[in-house]
From Swiss-Prot:
It comes from the Eukaryota. InterPro entries: FN3_dom, FN3_sf, Ig-like_fold. CDD domains: FN3. Pfam families: fn3. One of its GO terms (cellular component) is nucleus. The gene is FNDC8. Residues 179-280 form the Fibronectin type-III domain. SMART domains: FN3. Signal peptide: none annotated. This is Fibronectin type III domain-containing protein 8.
Amino acid sequence: MASEALHQVGDGEEAVLKKENFNMMNALDQLPKPFPNPKSMNRTVTTKGLPLSSKGNLVNFLEDDTINLPKPMPVDDSDCSSDDTSISAFSSTLLNPIKLAVTQPNSSFFAGMLEGELNKLSFSPMAKNTEKEDLALGPCPCPSKCQMATRGLLDLDNPELETETSSTHSESSVVVDLPDTPFIFEHTVSNSTAVISWTYALGKQPVSFYQVLLQEAAETQENELPKAKNRPWIFNKILGTTVKLMELKPNTCYCLTVRAANTAGVGKWCKPYKFATLATDFSSFPENNPIQITVRRKEPQRKIVSIGLEEMRRLEDLEYLFPY
């Protein structure tokens, strides 16, 4: 009897322990799970373009030289990665399927940015002195513009601020002009990707970032400007001079233009650069070894020719001897 009673007591303790373990497991399951480490997550380093108005085309945007960016739409955090550098967070269903990857900026780009910052620092004592004098004389005649300029980059959506050539009234001694127009000199295409590179003018006006405008173009003749087929897509705040466009349509012509921006505003768009993707023909070449084509061009050099008085007299004599 005693052994039987002990056996029953042991079974009861074992049942109590099992019940406590089961309750503990349920409590652990109900606790909120921690968010996974963002460093271990797979992130995309691509930029999605922002659609512009369907009424305009690339030629109209280049003539007007103004772009009104639409306001961002509220979406969930899961629709957009934290590394997405697009202008605003749009739903993936409304975005153009074309993606853009920005390569690491070259050393000359960083050198230009550093030179611009050093120029600002060198003129900072002079700016402070002039600012004290202006405050002693009276208030700023244009407070709205001064407040906007002290925040750094100007608002590109406001056309009134695009033509400003100085940051504040007190910094009038430091003249910052608009950046030069970029020149696209190379592109490499395949059936679905395109790598576009343009030049950066070292030693001239500093550049804060670039804007890229892409649009599918219709076929035109040699001397004709590329006609817009669909509405353009803009990629903003690009730090670098080389971009890679992905998920393009095979055997399709595209038109691309670039402009630079700095503290003075935005520069002019470069001439439309036309390129075409290759056709997808798996019978002519294997799928795992696609063909790529690279095209390079040189920027035309301007030469200045000076003619003296003697050369002018010789030309006049030749014109007299050999009239038209």
